[in-house]
């Protein structure tokens, strides 16, 4: 059902019915309600699944980077990569933002749990960078959450804002410099 929901999201955003989802998934409506109490619960599961997939992808992609600081930079700036893609990526980004805000009103704790893998990914690299003497954050337990929220805020803005070619690369650099400074890291001269 999650794969079927993903296909419908790419074609319709969240403007699909549970009946359309069941038809796409090839399951009965009763089967849907056996797993999910509502469409919103399905969307939370889709977000959680997408977050897990993204974190796995980023972890694999960053495996060859030289140190925790390079991996942390990659993880933070990669959150904006989809914004510089084709029309389908832009539509997906807008869906993520609008759906996330709508779900946040009624499912704040569940949404935080679905997004926790990204915070955990950042926390692991912050701690590894601290152990390597590369960072000195004021609060290594909480700071990754604040960084995730900042990256999300930038993503939300640029999902809807027009931007010039190359602008996102500048934004990624500025986001990284801000986060590095906030974590007690030093900027290279």
Each predicted region: which residue ranges?
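Helix-turn-helix
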Residues: 4, 8-41, 45, 49
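Amphipathic alpha-helical interface segments
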Residues: 4-8, 24, 31, 78, ...
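Hydrophobic alpha-helical connector segments
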Residues: 45, 59-88, 144-147
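Short, basic, alpha-helical segments at the C-terminal edge of helix-turn-helix-like DNA-binding modules
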Residues: 48-56
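Phosphate/oxyanion-binding loops and surfaces in catalytic or ligand/nucleic-acid-binding neighborhoods
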Residues: 53, 82-86, 150-157, 178-186
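Short secondary-structure transition hinges
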Residues: 81-123, 131-135
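Hydrophobic/aromatic-rich alpha-helical bundle segments in the mid-to-C-terminal region
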Residues: 90-94, 108, 112, 131-176, ...
């Amino acid at each position: 059902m999650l794969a079927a929901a993903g296909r419908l999201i790419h074609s319709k955003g969240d403007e699909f019915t549970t009946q359309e989802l069941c038809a796409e998934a090839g399951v009965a409506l009763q089967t849907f309600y056996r797993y999910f109490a509502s469409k919103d619960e399905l969307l939370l599961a889709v977000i959680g699944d997408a977050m897990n997939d993204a974190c796995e992808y980023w972890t694999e992609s960053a495996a060859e980077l030289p140190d925790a600081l390079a991996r942390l930079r990659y993880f933070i700036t990669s959150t904006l990569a989809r914004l510089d893609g084709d029309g389908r990526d832009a539509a997906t980004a807008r869906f993520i933002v609008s759906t996330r805000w709508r779900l946040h009103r009624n499912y704040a704790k569940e949404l935080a749990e679905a997004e926790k893998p990204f915070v955990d990914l950042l926390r692991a690299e912050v701690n590894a960078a601290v152990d390597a003497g590369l960072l000195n954050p004021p609060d290594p337990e909480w700071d990754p959450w604040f960084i995730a929220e900042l990256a999300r805020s930038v993503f939300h803005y640029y999902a809807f804002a027009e931007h010039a070619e190359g602008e996102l690369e500048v934004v990624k650099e500025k986001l990284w410099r801000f986060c590095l400074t906030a974590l007690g890291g030093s900027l290279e001269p």
